[in-house]
């Protein structure tokens, strides 16, 4: 019997994996880690006696979740992406299934916060979960502030600097940092100095990133229209004004020098991957815009189904031809 952790390849996914590793280590369990993104195929073989944790991630299309659930002995899914949670609920309603996957799925918090809650509470009642989520360790809360965009409503939030501090680390180092953090927290160490040091590192790196991003945007950013094709029963496409950029390293902060909320609905970053697919990220600060829903529609309309994420940040995979020939129209062309 082997314990596996399948996790997303971003800060929230790495933090979730580190948290899970710390708690499993207290039980004498050393898990096998599988870093995933939506453009990757899970090719690993799982045994019928294995335990699988899927953290801050879901396999797409959703049938792959069902296939893995039916393969292994224990299947725990912890996620916070509203679009896929709603898809799961719709499948349950459509098929009339009364059972559900073990785990914790709740919008408004990050995967790391939910992972912390899951391992801390033997009774996973919603009341107990909400109570614990209000008292997560500071570093895990900062991950949530960043990943769910709560930081945008917090004056002088330290979440962006905290996230930036990990940009210089390998995935293994990030996972190890959070595993150590949680282990010491469980052993009642005071971690304030460690957290402050990490934030200060991030502040220094942010100064460099601001200058670098501003220079990058001068040659990479352009104004465009995003044409989102609705389901076939809807009357017409919806058109959004976007500031788009061809960029390998993404994040809404990269657009700081060119994003104008009074002109742009969405920030759109895209990159051609070595798989032959184009990964697209969407960001918005407008309350009336749901990037998760838009990403799902764009992904499903193209050659590769799937896509989604959060209201303020989401993504999908497509082809270069579909992105530049159908979805995105550069202003002036």
Residue ranges: model-predicted function:
Residues 172-209:
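Long, charge-rich alpha-helical interaction segments
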């Amino acid at each position: 019997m082997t314990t596996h952790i399948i996790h997303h390849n971003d800060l929230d996914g790495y933090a979730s994996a580190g948290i899970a590793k710390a708690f499993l280590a207290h039980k004498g369990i050393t898990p096998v880690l599988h870093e995933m993104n939506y453009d990757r195929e899970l090719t690993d073989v799982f045994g019928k006696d294995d335990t699988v944790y899927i953290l801050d991630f879901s396999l797409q299309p959703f049938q792959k979740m069902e296939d893995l659930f039916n393969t292994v002995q224990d299947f725990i899914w912890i996620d916070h992406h509203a679009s896929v949670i709603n898809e799961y609920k719709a499948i349950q309603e459509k098929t009339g299934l009364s059972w559900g996957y073990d785990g914790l799925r709740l919008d408004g918090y990050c995967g790391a916060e939910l992972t912390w809650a899951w391992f801390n509470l033997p009774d996973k009642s919603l009341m107990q979960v909400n109570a614990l989520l209000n008292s997560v360790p500071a570093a895990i809360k900062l991950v949530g502030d960043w990943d769910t965009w709560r930081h945008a409503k917090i004056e002088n939030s330290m979440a962006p600097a905290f996230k930036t501090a990990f940009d210089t680390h390998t995935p293994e180092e990030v996972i190890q940092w959070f595993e150590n953090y949680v282990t010491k927290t469980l052993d009642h160490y005071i971690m304030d100095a460690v957290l402050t040091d990490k934030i200060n590192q991030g502040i220094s790196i942010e100064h460099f990133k601001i200058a670098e991003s501003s220079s990058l945007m001068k040659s990479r950013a352009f104004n465009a229209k995003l044409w989102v094709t609705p389901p076939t029963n809807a009357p017409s496409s919806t058109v959004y004004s976007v500031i788009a950029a061809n960029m390998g390293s993404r994040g809404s902060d990269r657009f700081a020098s060119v994003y104008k909320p009074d002109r742009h609905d969405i920030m759109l970053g895209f990159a051609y991957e070595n798989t032959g697919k184009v990964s697209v990220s969407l960001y918005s600060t407008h309350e009336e815009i749901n990037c998760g829903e838009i990403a799902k529609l764009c992904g499903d309309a193209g050659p590769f189904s799937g896509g989604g994420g959060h209201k303020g940040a989401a993504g999908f995979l497509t082809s270069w031809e579909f992105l530049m020939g159908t979805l995105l129209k550069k202003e002036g062309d």
